[in-house]
Amino acid sequence: MWTSGRMSNAKNLFGLGVSLYFWGLMDLTTTVLSGSARPLTEGPEDNLSDKLHQRMKRSWVWNQFFVLEEYTGTDPLYVGKLHSDMDRGDGSIKYILSGEGAGIVFTIDDTTGDIHAIQRLDREERSQYTLRAQALDRRTGRPMEPESEFIIKIQDINDNEPKFLDGPYVASVPEMSPVGTSVIQVTATDADDPTYGNSARVVYSILQGQPYFSVDSRTGLIRTALMNMDREAKEYYEVIVQAKDMGGQLGGLAGTTTVNITLSDVNDNPPRFPQKHYQMSVLESAPVSSTVGRVVAKDLDEGINAEMKYSLVDGDGLDVFDINTDPNYQVGIITVRKPLSFESKKSYTLKVEGANPHLEMRFLNLGPFRDTTTVHISVEDVDEPPVFEPSFYFVEVPEDVEIGATIQIISAKDPDVTNNSIRYSIDRSSDPGRFFYVDITSGALMTARPLDREDVSWHNITVLAMELNNPSQVGSVSVTVKVLDVNDNAPEFARFYEAFVCENAKAGQLIQTVSAIDRDDPQEGQHFYYSLAPEAANNPNFTLRDNQDNTAWILTRRSGFRQHEQNIFYLPILISDNGRPVLSSTGTLTVHVCSCDEGGMVMSCNAEAYVLPVSLSRGALIAILACIFVLLVLVLLILSMRRQRKQPYIIDEEENIHENIVRYDDEGGGEEDTEAFDIAAMWNPREAQLVVKNRQDMLPEIESLSRYVPQACIMDNNVHNYVLAKLYEADMDLWAPPFDSLQTYMFEGNGSVAESLSSLQSVTTDSDQSYDYLTDWGPRFKKLAEMYGATDSSGALW
């Protein structure tokens, strides 16, 4: 049988027992027999039996050990003792411990069965351990008892202070809140065992923040404790809350947190103007909507509670001024509503009201939430430009008005008190034709040139008025002049008329309809009257019929017209209008006599241009145009092909092939310049001109002398002689750089001699040119000095 406990001097123990110890609190030994637990105390054996038969008031669980956490001693902590009734104390029984923490946290004396804790125990990390114990025969290793499981529970002590979940806390509560208004709830937790003692029982209290706030000791709810807290007096509060365990008793652990409480604003302060009277001034020339001044009502509230609405409630300038509210700065801006005049009114008085648009009903007793102030506005005089009365002129003038006639009196005056004299003029940019002028003193607008409605029917001019004493003050007015029509234009044919009459025409046949135009524009409308001119009133050939619709018909009076007798008739027609006075003009109608077929189709007459369109059909005309277009395309194609043909080479009678002489200038082993000579120009030296060309890749330090080369072999047409002349030119040039490559010139023809023309070879010629000065040019010209300097006459360059 197993027995667990802290053993005393008792020797005769039987059955399965468990001893429970509470280190630091109790020292009891309990033996469990048949489900009954009895405490064992140290004493004589004769008293032990009586003790065992005394029943405890409570039952003990045989398979549990309890040990306090956070043991700080230096020796291992004794937990309890395991004992088997098979153990006779001779060391033949070996106790083995296994399970959670065995060998690491807990150890067992394999001989005595004593269990010790060798590490610090923390209930908050682990509250219990489950282990298994076994008794073995030390010699054979055979189990003496079945393996038994037991639990070691860690007994809590108050080793953890309460901790707040969050912090610091931030909260707000409206100002003027009643006492007991909830602000925020804070919560602290204690890691100790809440089921054992008061180690985890937390009590809240305020260390700082009274008498403004209070906290519920059990829930941690913070409430207002003082009535009528005013944000404008104090806005921010710092409250320190303490949470203490052990129910707040002495010796308990405590933690603190900070709660920052802000009083939010309510509309409990009415607006007030800092001044009861404002004095402002404005120029009379201030434009409409310009700012006169600003007023502001102070409100101790903030945000929406400090918003302001300004209005004009009284005064003699309600229709002259406006006030608007600046939503960003809550300022009332007074502006000009109508134009001002110092001469009309010099000052105004306004009563301005500022009010809160957002009110709270529970604070209406603190009102009224509005205030008024008086604004005095003075209008300042300025030197204003002259003002025209009226501000616009409209004048109607007949176009036959005489030059110099007054058509309108323009009037302007100085609005200032000084009433300066006015001088008038016309803005010439508005009257470029200079049709009008204005009297400088009286303002009489007169005509300066004849007016013609048919040319310009409307004139828009600008008249200027300037103060005599202050020319910078200039006013202007627009004058619109409408030129009225008079009957000054005679009617005339609408276009040039040319009629045709057939030889077989009958009397009374219509040959032409005529109409007329008139540049005039009478109010009653145009109406024209047609008749034959007096000299043709009794015309035997043609007659005229007025249709009374501004048109007239020309009719034949007889038949039997003959081209060979007279092929053209001129018929004068008189056209009159209905104006006052009546104007008329004579237009001449040209009538051609033509031969026609029986259907009246013109066949031939002197005006061939009119016969063709009549005799040709539309299809024939299209065919003719198509043929003309095709011919034009063919001509353009032929011209284009001829331009693209290559010109044949001109070969003289001897069939000599002309080549080009190409000169290559090589320096440093590379071709730098190429000069090509057209052999056609060199073929006839009499006509060719010698052109000296300088090298473009090198400029001498000293300006080159004029290189004139006599025209050698002018009478010789052989190219060989021309090349010799070029060689001579190279020899005579003092500044020409040498060509270090062999120049080959090829010429196919009779008598061609190919020789070296290299400038290096020219040293061997009979030229008297000396190159000794090259030695004085420095190391850069050393190579040239060696090549062109004085050498042994017996030596050869190549």
Swiss-Prot record:
Disulfide bonds: none annotated. GO terms for molecular function: beta-catenin binding; cadherin binding; calcium ion binding. Residues 1-35 form the signal peptide. Gene3D superfamilies: Cadherins (2.60.40.60), TCF3-CBD (Catenin binding domain) (4.10.900.10). It comes from the Eukaryota. A motif (Cell attachment site) lies at residues 88-90. Its main location: membrane. Residues 60-164, 165-273, 274-392, 389-493, 493-615 form the Cadherin domain. Residues 640-798 are cytoplasmic. Pfam families: CADH_Y-type_LIR (PF01049), Cadherin (PF00028). InterPro entries: Cadherin, Cadherin-like_dom, Cadherin-like_sf, Cadherin_CS, Cadherin_Y-type_LIR, Catenin-bd_sf. Glycans are attached at residues 47, 260, 419, 460, 541. Detected in embryonic spinal cord, in the brachial and lumbar section of motor neurons (at protein level). Detected in ventro-lateral portion of embryonic spinal cord, in the brachial and lumbar section of embryonic motor neurons. Detected in embryonic adductor motor neurons and embryonic dorsal root ganglion. Detected in the caudal half of newly generated somites and in presomitic mesoderm. The chain crosses the membrane at residues 619-639. Keywords: Calcium, Cell adhesion, Cell membrane, Cleavage on pair of basic residues, Glycoprotein, Membrane, Metal-binding, Repeat, Signal, Transmembrane, Transmembrane helix. SMART domains: CA. Residues 59-618 are extracellular. GO terms for cellular component: adherens junction; catenin complex. Cadherins are calcium-dependent cell adhesion proteins. They preferentially interact with themselves in a homophilic manner in connecting cells; cadherins may thus contribute to the sorting of heterogeneous cell types. This is Cadherin-20. It comes from Gallus gallus. The lineage of its organism: Eukaryota, Metazoa, Chordata, Craniata, Vertebrata. The gene is CDH20.
